[in-house]
């Protein structure tokens, strides 16, 4: 965590990407001071805040007041909440509203919301006028530790999740930890899956720390800020090494190949499965598949499942309410995964806790056999 610095209760993680470098600020009260932080970086005259119908009543007024106090004029774009908002229809709406507001390249698009709003707003900012600057103000744990960092933006299509998008780095990320107090237990747990992921990728000591301290992370306070800062630093390190996902950055997709297929299988119905829950099940499946391929110990798979189950996350396909399509349909979704190259299946597998790696050309026959076994 060498790039994390402390200023009062605020942690700063720096993402050194040359001319596109930016800071992630983590701590309480950041929405109230957002205007001052943004004003010091703003080259234009105004901002457009993109949010959703769930977040707007909670935080939009406070953010706009902070912008007003800093002398920043703002427009507001409020979209429906939920994964289905990551669509062409709502992308077009957002772009049209930004153009109506006469947002220019040196102005700011501010994404106020969870991963859906961050992904869609960043995509809109990346294509309007061929690129408008933007700021992430993530309001869920999942978006604070994952989707708001790294510049990946996009929407879903009928062929799969996050298949259409651009790389567009933010100028600033403001992760106000106070907003996490408004999350439901289910939403917080779903975000925690992404926190645990960083330990499972290449930080076994962090995973062990989470096993010992997860209750304090859920309660709040310094342990929560520490977990978020460590997660952001872990992601920043990977992004700096491989910004465009040509190699190492694919490790961040641990659990996502299986997880995205399960999300598609539930038609992105959040009453059945949300993204972090899919990642939780997907990580257990990745460890179990690694054990099946004699790459990792079954004990590691059991350890991962035990911890995720302890915090209240689903760990099995059978934990998903309702019927799932057959294994062959799940396999079709996996074949559309963005990591597929030249038709070859690519998975993030593991040799143990904190020993994940990119596995190219995974035999489809092994995957389909494994899915049939787990589907039963």
Curated annotation (Swiss-Prot):
Keywords associated with the record: Amino-acid biosynthesis, Aromatic amino acid biosynthesis, Cobalt, Cytoplasm, Lyase, Metal-binding, NAD, Nucleotide-binding, Zinc
Catalytic reactions of this protein: 7-phospho-2-dehydro-3-deoxy-D-arabino-heptonate = 3-dehydroquinate + phosphate
Top EC class for this record: lyase
InterPro entries on file: Dehydroquinate_synthase, DHQ_synth_AroB, DHQ_synth_fam, DHQS/DOIS_N, DHQS_C
A Gene Ontology molecular function term of the record: 3-dehydroquinate synthase activity
Gene3D superfamilies: 3.40.50.1970, Dehydroquinate synthase-like - alpha domain
Origin: domain of life: Bacteria
Annotated compartments: Cytoplasm
UniProt key word Secreted: no
Binding site for Zn(2+): 194, 256, 275
Main subcellular location: cytoplasm
Cofactor mode of binding and number, as noted: Binds 1 divalent metal cation per subunit. Can use either Co(2+) or Zn(2+).
Pathway per the UniProt entry: Metabolic intermediate biosynthesis; chorismate biosynthesis; chorismate from D-erythrose 4-phosphate and phosphoenolpyruvate: step 2/7
EC number annotated for this UniProt entry: 4.2.3.4
GO BP, sorted A to Z: amino acid biosynthetic process; aromatic amino acid family biosynthetic process; chorismate biosynthetic process
Binding residues annotated for NAD(+), in chain numbering: 115-119, 139-140, 152, 161
Function: Catalyzes the conversion of 3-deoxy-D-arabino-heptulosonate 7-phosphate (DAHP) to dehydroquinate (DHQ).
Family: Belongs to the sugar phosphate cyclases superfamily. Dehydroquinate synthase family.
Protein name from the UniProt record: 3-dehydroquinate synthase
Gene name of the record: aroB
């Amino acid at each position: 965590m060498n790039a994390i610095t402390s200023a009062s209760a605020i942690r700063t993680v720096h993402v050194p990407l040359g001319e596109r470098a930016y800071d992630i600020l983590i701590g309480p009260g950041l929405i109230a001071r957002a205007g001052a932080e943004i004003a010091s970086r703003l080259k234009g005259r105004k901002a457009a805040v993109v949010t959703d119908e769930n977040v707007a009543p909670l935080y939009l007024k406070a953010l706009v007041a902070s912008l007003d106090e800093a002398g920043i004029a703002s427009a507001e774009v409020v979209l429906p909440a939920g994964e289905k908002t990551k669509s062409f229809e709502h992308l077009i709406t957002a772009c049209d509203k930004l153009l109506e507001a006469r947002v220019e390249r040196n102005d700011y698009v501010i994404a106020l919301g969870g991963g859906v709003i961050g992904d869609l707003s960043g995509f809109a900012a990346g294509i309007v006028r061929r690129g408008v600057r933007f700021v992430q103000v993530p309001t869920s744990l999942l978006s604070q530790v994952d989707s708001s960092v790294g510049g990946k933006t996009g929407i879903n299509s009928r062929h799969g999740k996050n298949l259409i998008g651009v790389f567009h780095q933010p100028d600033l990320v403001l992760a106000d930890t106070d907003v996490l107090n408004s999350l439901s237990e289910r939403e917080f747990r779903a975000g925690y899956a992404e926190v645990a992921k960083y330990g499972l990728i290449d930080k076994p000591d962090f995973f062990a720390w989470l096993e010992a301290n997860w209750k304090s992370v859920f309660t709040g306070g310094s342990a929560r800020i520490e977990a978020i800062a460590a997660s952001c630093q872990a992601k920043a390190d990977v992004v700096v090494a491989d910004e465009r996902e040509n190699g190492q950055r694919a490790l961040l997709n641990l659990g996502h190949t299986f997880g995205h297929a399960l999300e598609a299988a539930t038609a992105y119905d959040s009453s059945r499965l949300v993204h972090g829950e899919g990642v939780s099940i997907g990580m257990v499946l990745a460890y179990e598949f690694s054990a099946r391929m004699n790459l990792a110990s079954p004990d590691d798979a059991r350890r991962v499942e035990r911890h995720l189950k302890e915090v209240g996350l689903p760990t099995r396909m059978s934990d998903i309410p309702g019927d799932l399509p057959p294994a062959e349909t799940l396999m079709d979704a996996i074949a559309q995964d963005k990591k597929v190259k030249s038709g070859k299946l690519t998975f993030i597998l593991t040799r143990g806790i904190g020993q994940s790696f990119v596995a190219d050309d995974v035999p489809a026959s092994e995957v389909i056999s494994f899915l049939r076994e787990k589907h039963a």
